[in-house]
Amino acid sequence: VSTVHTRRITGLETEFGITSVLDSHRRLGPDEVARYLFAPVVDRYRSSNIYWRNGSRVYLDVGAHPEYATAECDSLHQLVAYDRSGEVIFHRLAEQCERTLAERGIGGKVYLLKNNTDSLGNSYGCHENFLVSRDVPLKALSAQLLPFLVTRQLICGAGKISVPSPGAPNENFGPGFCLSQRSDHVWEGVSSATTRSRPIINTRDEPHADSARYRRLHVIVGDSNMSETTTALKVGSALLVLEMIEAGVELPDFELSNEIRSIREISRDFSGSTPLDLRNGGTVTALAIQQAFHAAAVDWLDQRGEDGTGTPNSQLADVVDLWGRVLDCFGTGDFSPVDTEIDWVIKKSLIDAVAERGNLGITDPRLAQIDLTYHDINPDRGLFHLLVRRGRAKTLIDPAEILAATEQAPATTRAAVRGKFLHAAEESTRQTTVDWTRLKVNGEGGGELLLPDPFCTGSPEIDAALADLTDLLAEAPA
């Protein structure tokens, strides 16, 4: 029997879109803008791939995409706070980038977008990481999880206007609003590649933990969410499903015969009623799949144990409540009860209102502009942030908590040790090497500390070894 993890290590990786609009005739490609964005990081750390003071990773991914990977978190609201802190960190870098460009006589604006597709049809991701027990075979885990992941865009998609282009995955669909940004950009269910085939679940096994006990489930099908309540629903519902799978809860067999065709069709159906073919014969709707998982989660929450660690039942009760309310809206066709809490609904309400007022068709560039500006992480400029200020989009996390999360690592996971080391390293002239499981002071008379357990915030041995490393950092390099 598997262990049920009500305290589970989770993390979110977000790739941001980057673009600039310059005052001069000069144009900067995304690569150049990204280099300017990361210049202060490279100046200070001699690398564009670093760990930030808060234990999270800040780096420039392939294809000029700035990326933020949260430190290890072990509860839901903590994860949402650290995800949001990444936006704040990158917004500050963008402001600095604009100042640098102005000093060089290249005035203009730098835009960082927390979305998943650009105007050229490229896609970039929001990847969710969950530590899961090896007691559950991957095949069984995937079989139960895939139908949930394919259909959960109903409840947590970010929404987008899809305009078909030749050779693109959407070429056979007419223009229109979609529930999900990523649904047109995944090509298979389970795979070990991330970019070439872009699966729903990635199986490349680097658990960053004891590989005999754990595997890291890497989910790459999700949309990046602006809404904190939608992020909490996306991750919280997945946490509940994983707990139920580990507990051996009898979940219905919804193995789909073609996940990829299904995911694209679901994205264009606001009733959730498109029939999907099942592998064992018969059909089922996306709404019915989500309703079954939701009903199971309601029952599970009634018996879910608590020990004061991990995600409390109160946070998951809010998740289950919102989950149910969104599904009820699919039944009635009226989404106004959740139009401040779910990204795709918030965005669609805005686009519909502007389109109606100006009598605009769905392919009008003014609507495309709204679609993009919704995801601008600049709090003074981004449409989502404007809606928050106007009371038209809910928040979950105290802004002070988000700001604190830009400086301090999560106190309840291994990241706490990394955070202490990183703060000491900031004051030091010595070179260091840091990754998820290792802290190292380089050079002669250096030292290293291995941290294989992501749940461990310290021990007498770790604390002593960290103190030794901190002492080394206080010395001048040999």
PLM ranges: what are they?
Residues V1-L113, L145-G157, G189-I201, E206-A478:
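Terminal catalytic/cofactor-binding subdomain
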Residues G108-S192:
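Internal, well-ordered domain-core segments that constitute the primary functional module
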